[in-house]
């Protein structure tokens, strides 16, 4: 990227940007919800489109001069619909959380019952956490995973739905590493008369590539972010059946937001275009391959992988038998240039600020070119750091930097 202007006009901000660039280039990024966008996506986000206000929708704006930005929003919508084979797409949500909020407010009233996945079992704040708007405005009935398999027990799920008769059932997760049976959930929704909403933010890229069953044929509403496995800009999107299109669009604008971010929508259009290319399927397959090898290697080192493995891009590691908390492991790994995040595990006994586990994912490292052999090295680094936490780890930091230097991101 060309930062010549900001380098001259604001050296303080420029130095921070360069510092973060160096961190990304020299660290192994294992945050499951992060990725590295293409330069094309970045260029779209930094384009002239940022200057245009465009409240409303293409062909029906509240400002003049929108005939150009209308084109980029239409392009983003059409590419999104083609990518996911959806009837309707709204690409205006600023984030996944706002996309979820827009769906709730489109068809629910405060106090209605929502069934959502427990946060400690892998759900998301917006699926009913009591500290989130969703938990404050709606009556939340949480479901979780089996204490035996640490996977969703669909029969227990069904029984709970029959008991509480929710107005909406939300599926999807932020820390669940297994395939979700959307067909089965659709059957349960039909049985209890509930709307079906799927938050596919984490797995959207895998769905687009055909590596995870798509929720689109089954769900009334599907939300997503456009970063994570889609490798696009920070933002959200909503897909729905055509019969709900007007309700969703009204809920996003004027219900939830004012002017859309046209430069981000342009980045989304570029992202969807990239995901429609054949090589994106190869990339997504490598994400999954890397995650599986990573999980297998960590298991060999004695780490316990929640649910026994992974079917997607992430893995949740229970550190209990390693006698270290998620918080301490996060800081320890960060000290050698490996970025992961502390995370609760099913049936968590520690505070969410401490945790018994860490969550790790492979989208970012796959984007920079890591394959199976590199993931084995990363597993070795992690094991060494945890096992030798009281020793000098400077040699591991050096090896991490050397590995990263062979796989530059933007250089």
Swiss-Prot record:
SUPFAM superfamilies recorded: PLP-dependent transferases
Record's subunit section: Homodimer.
Family annotation (NCBIfam families): PRK00011.1
One annotated Gene Ontology cellular component of this protein: cytosol
EC number: 2.1.2.1
CDD domains registered for this protein in UniProt: SHMT
Top-rank taxon, per record: Bacteria
Keyword set, alphabetical order: Amino-acid biosynthesis, Cytoplasm, One-carbon metabolism, Pyridoxal phosphate, Transferase
Cofactor field: pyridoxal 5'-phosphate
Catalyzed chemical reaction(s): (6R)-5,10-methylene-5,6,7,8-tetrahydrofolate + glycine + H2O = (6S)-5,6,7,8-tetrahydrofolate + L-serine
Pfam families to which the protein is assigned, alphabetical: SHMT
Main location: cytoplasm
Record-linked InterPro entries: PyrdxlP-dep_Trfase (IPR015424), PyrdxlP-dep_Trfase_major (IPR015421), PyrdxlP-dep_Trfase_small (IPR015422), Ser_HO-MeTrfase (IPR001085), Ser_HO-MeTrfase-like (IPR049943), Ser_HO-MeTrfase_PLP_BS (IPR019798), SHMT-like_dom (IPR039429)
Gene Ontology BP terms: glycine biosynthetic process from serine; tetrahydrofolate interconversion
Annotated pathway: One-carbon metabolism; tetrahydrofolate interconversion; Amino-acid biosynthesis; glycine biosynthesis; glycine from L-serine: step 1/1
Function: Catalyzes the reversible interconversion of serine and glycine with tetrahydrofolate (THF) serving as the one-carbon carrier. This reaction serves as the major source of one-carbon groups required for the biosynthesis of purines, thymidylate, methionine, and other important biomolecules. Also exhibits THF-independent aldolase activity toward beta-hydroxyamino acids, producing glycine and aldehydes, via a retro-aldol mechanism.
Annotated site residue numbers, Plays an important role in substrate specificity: 227
Molecular function terms from GO: glycine hydroxymethyltransferase activity; pyridoxal phosphate binding
Cellular compartments annotated: Cytoplasm
Residues annotated as signal peptide: none
Protein family according to the UniProt entry: Belongs to the SHMT family.
Residues binding (6S)-5,6,7,8-tetrahydrofolate: 119, 123-125, 351-353
Residue positions, PTM N6-(pyridoxal phosphate)lysine: 228
Name the UniProt record assigns to this protein: Serine hydroxymethyltransferase
């Amino acid at each position: 990227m060309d930062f010549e202007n900001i380098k001259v006009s604001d050296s303080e901000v420029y130095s921070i940007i360069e510092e973060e660039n160096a961190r990304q280039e020299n660290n192994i990024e294992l945050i499951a919800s992060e990725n590295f966008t293409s330069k094309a996506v970045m260029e779209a986000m930094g384009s002239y489109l940022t200057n245009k206000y465009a409240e409303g929708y293409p062909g029906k704006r509240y400002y003049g001069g929108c005939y150009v930005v209308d084109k980029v929003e239409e392009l983003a919508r059409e590419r999104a619909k083609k990518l996911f084979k959806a009837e309707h797409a709204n690409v205006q949500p600023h984030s996944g959380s706002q996309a979820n909020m827009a769906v709730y407010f489109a068809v629910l009233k405060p106090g209605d019952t929502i069934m959502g996945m427990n946060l400690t079992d892998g759900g998301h704040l917006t699926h009913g956490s009591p500290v989130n708007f969703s938990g404050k405005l709606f009556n939340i009935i949480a479901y979780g995973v089996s204490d035996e398999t640490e996977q969703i027990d669909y029969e227990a799920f069904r029984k709970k739905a029959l008991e509480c008769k929710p107005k909406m059932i939300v599926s999807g997760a932020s820390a669940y590493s297994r395939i979700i049976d959307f067909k089965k959930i659709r059957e349960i929704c039909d049985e209890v008369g509930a709307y079906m909403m799927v938050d596919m933010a984490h797995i959207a890229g895998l769905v687009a590539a055909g590596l995870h069953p798509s929720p689109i044929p089954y769900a009334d509403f599907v939300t997503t972010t456009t970063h994570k496995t889609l490798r696009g800009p920070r933002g959200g999107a909503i897909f729905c059946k055509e019969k709900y299109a007007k309700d969703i669009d009204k809920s996003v604008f004027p219900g939830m937001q004012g002017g859309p971010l046209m430069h981000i929508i342009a980045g989304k259009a570029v992202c969807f275009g990239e995901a429609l290319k054949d090589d994106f399927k190869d990339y997504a397959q490598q994400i999954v391959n890397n995650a599986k090898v990573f999980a297998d290697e960590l298991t060999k080192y004695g780490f316990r992988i929640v649910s026994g493995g992974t079917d997607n891009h992430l893995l949740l590691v229970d550190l209990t038998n390693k006698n270290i908390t998620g918080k301490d492991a996060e800081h320890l790994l960060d000290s050698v240039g490996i970025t992961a995040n502390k995370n609760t595990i099913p049936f968590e006994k520690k505070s969410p600020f401490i945790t018994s586990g860490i969550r790790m994912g492979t989208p970012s490292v796959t984007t920079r070119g890591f394959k199976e052999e590199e993931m084995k090295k990363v597993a070795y680094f992690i094991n060494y750091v945890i096992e030798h936490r009281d020793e000098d780890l400077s040699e591991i930091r050096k090896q991490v930097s050397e590995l990263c230097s062979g796989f530059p991101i933007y250089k």
